[in-house]
Amino acid sequence: MRLRFLLTALTLAALMTGCTVRSLNPLYGEKDVVFEPALLGTWAEHDDASSNWTFQKSGENGYRLVSSEGTKTLDGRLVKLSGRLFLDVTPKDGDDSLEIPAHLFIKIELSGDTLRTAMLDADWFDKTADLKTLGLSYIRINDKVVLTGPTKELQSFAVKYGGDETVFSHLQDYRRTAVDLAK
């Protein structure tokens, strides 16, 4: 139990610190945000049912994501671009006043009671010789890529590379364990 908690905490820390590609700007404009009621509820990792995320409705078109350990709460917006769904998440206000609330993009596929996620691959970005050829504005902070481009630029990238599993990798499958009846 303690090991599972530690592994989940480390995964969450990696998500919101430096092991992922973050962006200063969102992947969405208000017209791009969609709400999918089927996401509401609790989703457990296929490999570890004790590690899960609960999606709750937040505002008109948003989500509040809470980890099973309650160690991290994220705000999320679901974005539909060229038929693909992306979840744009940021730390919940007040989680860390010293942290810039960067955006993290997660490609998702939802099929019944199965949710598959894929994250932008930081290693792929690091190995790409010239990010400028990708049409992305960025800076490097402590050798990590931080995207700085406007929303339209980020969306063009997501549309172009959303189907590439070398760009959106780190696949994780979840299964629904509870449905939110307050849809």
Model-assigned labels for residue ranges:
Residues 15-18:
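C-terminal motif of bacterial Sec signal peptides marking the signal peptidase cleavage site
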Residues 7-9, 180:
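Intrinsically disordered, low-complexity segments enriched in polar/charged small residues
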Residues 1-7:
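Bacterial N-terminal signal peptides that target proteins for export
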Residues 20-38, 46-183:
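Calycin-type beta-barrel ligand-binding domains and close structural analogs
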